[in-house]
Amino acid sequence: MTPHDPVSVEAVPKIELHVHLEGTVEPATVLDIAARNGLALPVSTVDELSALYRVTTFSDFLRLWILTTNVLRKAEDFSQVVVDYARRAKRHGAVYIEGIFSPVERVMRGVGWAEIFDGYCEGAERAYAEHGVVVRLTPEAYRGADPELVAEMVRYAGRYRDRGVVGVGIGGDERARPTRHYAAAFAPAVDLGLGVVPHAGEFPLFPDGASGAATLRETIEALNPVRIRHGIAAAADPALVAVIRERGIVLDVCPTSNLRTGAIRDLADHPLPRLAAAGIPCTVGTDDPAVFDTDLSREFTIAARLGVEPRLLYDAGITGALCDDDVKSHLRQIGAATTWPTTTATWSTTAAGESL
């Protein structure tokens, strides 16, 4: 095979740094886990729950998130989520995943910290043993949470560093509470060996017309992150683009998610190619693939159609990954052994994708 031969999108190795593990759970699995845990849902069939998965706004997404994540209560639930996603992602070429999970909400509903962390870590170990996919974990709090609970999350993350927890983050409504209110909670992260990987800059414009660049800038100044999940609001602010580039911050971008939540109106206008052209390392991820009906092949295809080559995404993934040097070396070897497509003309796919 030469770089000019057609290359299957599924065959190209992929690194995913932005996926919420709770958002990978498909409707049938939600119903199964709810039944296993003796929990009642407002719907009883896969079709009824699938209808709720068709979100068109961020508010729709948050309502669904609360409904579906509340069924996860036991270590076996959390472990199953990781293993199931690793199996599906492998079919799309995933070789390394940094999965996000949200322990604070579960703790507030009576689930123990250890139950959550043990379950997800066991799932990461099983994902590699059963499917050969390296999974690392980044627990995440939400803006609006009690800062002391967030600090406790960071402390627990440090205790599980040797089981694959590599970073910590914060997400949710960017204007619910200023990120600086959580600066003290995240301050110990570096000494614990953890990278800080918050969500910010998801919306270039908020519904009231305010710029998303302001909350992105505030998050960068408050937390000094190594990566930003989303970050597309930076594209409208050249000074902020310069800050991100100079600090070496990697952006974990999710095109389909941005379309589904209304962050952008048209994939053809997505800022990913502008950010990449500005010298910012960008990865693409699925965010919440079960909710947004997407997968890694689809996201890489969208990026390719926007002019961002898969090798560039893969190399940015290595740059941003919080794994140890041995794993990074392994990922570089995979990249070096791959025949990468050099133009979108050689990028063949059977994956579903939005027209651009």
Swiss-Prot record:
* GO terms of biological process kind: menaquinone biosynthetic process
User: How is the co-factor bound, per the entry?
Assistant: Binds 1 zinc ion per subunit.
A Pfam family for this UniProt protein?
A_deaminase
Q: Which residues act catalytically here?
A: 202
The protein's matches in InterPro entries, at most eight in alphabetical order, are given as: A_deaminase_dom (IPR001365), Ado/ade_deaminase (IPR006330), Metal_Hydrolase (IPR032466)
Q: Indicate what this protein is called per its UniProt record.
A: Aminodeoxyfutalosine deaminase
**Enzyme Commission no:** 3.5.4.40
State where Zn(2+) binds.
18, 20, 199, 287
Pathway terms, separated by semicolons: Quinol/quinone metabolism; menaquinone biosynthesis
Task performed by this protein: Catalyzes the deamination of aminodeoxyfutalosine (AFL) into futalosine (FL), a step in the biosynthesis of menaquinone (MK, vitamin K2). Is very poorly efficient on 1-(6-amino-9H-purin-9-yl)-1-deoxy-N-ethyl-beta-D-ribofuranuronamide (NECA), adenosine, 5'-methylthioadenosine, 5'-deoxyadenosine, 2'-deoxyadenosine, and AMP as substrate.
